[in-house]
């Protein structure tokens, strides 16, 4: 028996006619890293909630088929018991954090305390996960004083501290900057190597292609495919299904570069190998055209010597200077850099 089995799973929310999940079947083993993709409304979040018993125990409705986790039926096992095996991380950390604790340390320890984990073990687990997710320096801060990305890492740490055997992540990097996203993917990959089964719902196809062992493709509640990233992203119908493949794959489609098995590469390393095999291919880099710079427009927005801090010991802006004209301007920076505060 596989560690997780989904057999002909069907589900319809109350007061609706359309199935949110329509005959889903697949298996997963310990330590597999599986991505779940599909356009909005495909059933991704509903499926993840079925893994941990929220569907149908909390979200009522018409339920059929079976989800089994290590021999335990997810639909009938109390969620309080099932959460020891299956951890779910929401897209929005506001929906995950308890609000009952004033510090990051206490928030991450909250679930462990509820299950009566000894204090010594709690300290060991918290030391581990807070360093893993690079939030050790925030351990004495209130979680709701952190940026969105930092809060998400606290939410992830709270679940990881429970040491689940299956980890479900519902777009966990949606509020993280590129560096934070890479850290989360790398951390989750390491967790998979320790034997934790990972299911990650994501829109960042490049990341999924690089990290996942398999990908589950859903469309309008139906299972379209369950296969390797190379085979999934080589499908000719992805655009019709609302999926944009990784840039590397799109490039290889244009250049007619293939892997030995006939699929398109999804990683840069595979592209290099494909280029070596295709001696006739000629790859040309785009040339920068001569650009005539127009005279800079007049400034319409000026910031001079801006100073601001939420607390006395943590300034957000210190002698900040900025001049803008009518041209569009992007504001970028790591989580906590001050982007939202400036806005």
Where are these regions (language model features)?
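Conserved catalytic motifs of ABC-family nucleotide-binding domains
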Residues: 163
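Conserved ABC ATPase "signature" region
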Residues: 109, 113, 120-138
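Conserved beta-strand-loop-alpha-helix hinge in the C-terminal portion
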Residues: 222-249
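Conserved ABC ATPase signature
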Residues: 142-146, 150
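H-loop/switch region of ABC-family ATPase nucleotide-binding domains
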Residues: 202-203
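The feature captures the beta-strand-to-loop junction immediately N-terminal to the Walker
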Residues: 37-39, 332-334
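Catalytic Walker B motif of ABC-type/P-loop ATPase nucleotide-binding domains
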Residues: 167-170
